[in-house]
Amino acid sequence: MLLHIPAIFTAEEVSRIRAALEQAEWADGKATAGYQSAKAKHNLQLPQDHPLAREIGEAMLQRLWNHPLFMSAALPLKVFPPLFNCYTGGGSFDFHIDNAVRDIHGGRERVRTDLSSTLFFSDPEDYDGGELVIQDTYGLQQVKLPAGDLVLYPGTSLHKVNPVTRGARYASFFWTQSLVREDSQRTLLFEMDQSIQRLTRDVPDHPSLIRLTGTYHNLLRRWSEL
């Protein structure tokens, strides 16, 4: 499942965040890449322990934890702290698949990368190129969203970032370990939950809603891992 979640941050908030990112000291993005990915990665990245990365990352997660669409789709158990990158001057990241497991907190905890997310902090007209290209069951999907919007997609996806030939593309990316590791099961639960929400709005007293809601929770109980 590939899902576009709009307006995590307002235009005013994005403007302040981008201004702060533009003033930050960036490092070579290869520092956080795996052995194979490092050969394909050509971008800049904020150090993981940078105060600005922690500040914006905490604000992002607070928003997402209160966002019904993200919670319904991701069913998050744990999240790898958001990272921040900048593509400019031809920067790119060739096709790769993200590492299956990431260490956090100095290796004391691990996150399985069931889902990948990218939150854009540059508007499409601010740069040329820079499309996030994701290969899914329907072929190659090119993603270039308005600033403040997020795309959520399976961590198993082959993906790349096209070269940025003008301007700069600022974004955050992170991984989520879901309660439900299998993408097809998460997709089924998401579609059920969205249908239940629409039925609750349109026909709130329909007797089948109780049974349908119960079926959703029984499936979640069967498939979830804690």
UniProtKB/Swiss-Prot annotation:
SMART domains: P4Hc. Keywords: Dioxygenase, Iron, Metal-binding, Oxidoreductase, Vitamin C. Its cofactor is Fe(2+); L-ascorbate. Disulfide bonds: none annotated. Fe cation binds at residues 96, 98, 159. The lineage of its organism: Bacteria, Pseudomonadati, Pseudomonadota, Gammaproteobacteria, Pseudomonadales. It holds the Pfam family PKHD_C. GO terms for biological process: DNA damage response; intracellular iron ion homeostasis. This is PKHD-type hydroxylase PLES_48951. The keyword Iron applies. It comes from Pseudomonas aeruginosa (strain LESB58). PANTHER family: PKHD-TYPE HYDROXYLASE YBIX. One of its GO terms (molecular function) is iron ion binding. It is an enzyme of class 1 (oxidoreductase).
